[in-house]
């Protein structure tokens, strides 16, 4: 069977929008900054904020505070840099909270991925080969697009045994909104395509879809898609 599958760009819609509080202390060479971040990566936040301010990393502390979910949407920097720079220059605590509209516009979305898939099985319904070419729209900036497409490539074989695999996934930059981390991290889009062709093959082979999957599912000791042993 041969088919093209396409997924859409999706918004995380986490409960609370991005919010940051930055509090400066001291003066001159002793000046430091404590940032309360609702993000997902305190070390990356610290490093990026220090670079924005042009100071040593040791002068910036980032503390993660509880938030109403993120699902990958707060993995990239959002308003941490804005709050930090304003607090540093003004010498006063600064809090920056995005509106829902600002949040929608600013943070990365789930990657739309187009997957051209060719797959086959023998007359008994045993999977033979899988050929996939996937392109992910990462938008104008890279974010973690390369890793998302790497994960998509690793998961597109699904939990099945294939006699032959030929898989290539590419993250491309476009003039569309930026895409990055989203729960599943590329595996969701890949599995949508995989399970689609499994259904098509089962129908052509005249085998119940559940039985077809049971016949081909990996078991302990099998080597599957990414080369890992189950």
What are these regions (language model features)?
Residues 1-230:
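Structural alpha/beta core scaffold segments of enzyme domains
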């Amino acid at each position: 069977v041969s088919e093209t599958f396409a997924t859409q760009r999706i918004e995380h819609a986490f409960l609370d929008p991005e919010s940051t509080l930055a509090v400066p202390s001291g003066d001159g060479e002793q000046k430091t900054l404590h940032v309360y971040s609702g993000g997902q990566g305190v070390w990356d936040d610290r490093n990026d904020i220090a670079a924005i301010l042009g100071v040593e990393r040791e002068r910036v502390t980032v503390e993660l505070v509880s938030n109403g979910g993120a699902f990958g949407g707060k993995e990239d920097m959002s308003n941490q840099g804005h709050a930090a720079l304003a607090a540093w220059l003004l010498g006063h605590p600064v809090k920056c909270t995005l509106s829902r509209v600002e949040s929608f516009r600013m943070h990365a979305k789930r990657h739309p991925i187009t997957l051209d898939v060719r797959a086959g099985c023998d007359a008994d319904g045993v999977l033979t080969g899988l050929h996939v070419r996937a392109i992910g729209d990462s938008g104008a900036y890279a974010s973690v697009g390369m890793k998302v497409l790497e994960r998509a490539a690793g998961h597109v074989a699904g939990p099945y045994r294939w006699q032959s695999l030929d898989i290539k996934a590419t993250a491309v930059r476009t003039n569309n909104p930026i895409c990055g981390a989203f729960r599943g991290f590329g595996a969701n889009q890949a599995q949508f395509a995989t399970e689609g062709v499994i259904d098509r093959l089962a129908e052509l082979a005249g085998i119940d879809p559940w039985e077809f999957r049971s016949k081909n599912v990996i078991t302990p000791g099998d080597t599957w898609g990414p080369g890992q042993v189950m």
